[in-house]
Amino acid sequence: MSIEVVKPGLSTTVQDLGRPGYYHLGIPLSGALDQYSCRLANLLVGNDESAAVLECTLLAPELAFTDNAIIAVAGAQATPRINGKDVESNASLAVKAGDTLGFDLMKAGARTYIAVAGGIDVPMVLGSRSTYALGAIGGLHGRKLAAGDRLPVGNPGREARAGRTVDIGLVSSMAKELALRVLPGLYFHRLTESSADTFFADTWTVASEADRIGYRYRRGRALHFLERQQPFGAGSDPSNIVDAGYPYGSIQVPGGLEPIVLLRDAVSGGGYAMIGAVISADMDCIAQMQPNNKARFLLVDMPLALSARAERQQRLVRLRAALAG
């Protein structure tokens, strides 16, 4: 079975849950930016949660099916259409050989996930089918999809069937204004006291430079770092440090001007001070922010971060239970 890419959309890639374990070698996590929506789409079609799906950014693709298949669409609010007719999101759907899947514009959210029963069956690279375009590995030829590509699909499992739905309470909302919870980082103390306050007080806007590597935020007040004699190996700007590792979700502010939250395709280290990190429970939310959406950063402590992670895990438990069988 295969799927033909008629129109690739703005940036459509093959992703699964990622390839942890190689960050120390400079190979990032990759994988779906919105892990929850990826899991939801897979569970709807009876796949293992780790099966490869299509991640579609801002403008979804047009796909033609060469065989009968079971599919599901989750994530951003973009109405799917089979042969031009509106169909449901967050539900498993039957498509027939010769059918075409398309979408309208994403009204809220930035990433839609398309799962096919059997999963997108591209080769595994370092234990994952995820595309890491900067390194040209994984996915389909290590790149985003192009018109004319053919995507191989694995054999559907016994759980594959149309008509499976999920309660709206288990579907992620796509808010256009968010509060992103942040743990202070190793270099938070390098900010002046007033900048530490304004970072959390200001409302920031998602810039157009927002992709799988990182999300840039602007229109808040510039941040100032304490002056110091820069150590050997650090850059000349106070926001520079001697190179250090970058945690997933970490926040750097080059030149003190615009915070950047590093995502799943970010490099593993560099010379900018990490003033904090968005907690893991909120990273899926960033993935669904469109340019010009608004965000506030909210300072939290480790107990709250761990509690939020536990709540997120419980939500996954409820999702699995709702779609079991």
Which stretches of residues belong to each language-model region?
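Conserved "landmark" site that anchors the functional core of diverse proteins
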Residues: 1-325
